[in-house]
């Protein structure tokens, strides 16, 4: 666990790194190469400084994907995790658009304010550095702490994300993100995101098993 002093010191260090126009190799190593690279990509995207929420895309009726169907099967489990952990859980598609969320009462208002809801477009080119987009970019688990985020309105957040991998094709189908306030930062956050990704992947396996069963007796 981190103390409040540890976390405040981490925020101060990040602010100091942000003041430099270019990151030295030592600074990039301190920050983490994936975050440093994301900052550089974000800076080149001409994201409006006044942007405080992700663009919100209209949710049109469309055919359900395998990820949508898997979420229907495991949404109760994920919602329970969100409620018990004082977090908001979001699942995004491969384009960084959120397709499903469940939120604790503690995070609901904050999530709605920044459009961390279904339809929110969290691609780096829209909102800059964030864990959801970073995990899709690197195809690895990620953590973005407080002011490591590009958009100032989520500097009070810490976010953990993990890609959702198709257990059969091994392709990335989407991403799951767990977010809470920076004061609740925990070293187990990334493991929790990976656990949620595993829950979705188990639902994908069961979904495929049911399809094969139906096909066998059709």
Task: Pin down the residues of each PLM region.
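Cytosolic beta-strand hydrophobic patch enriched in CBS
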Residues: 90-91, 163-165
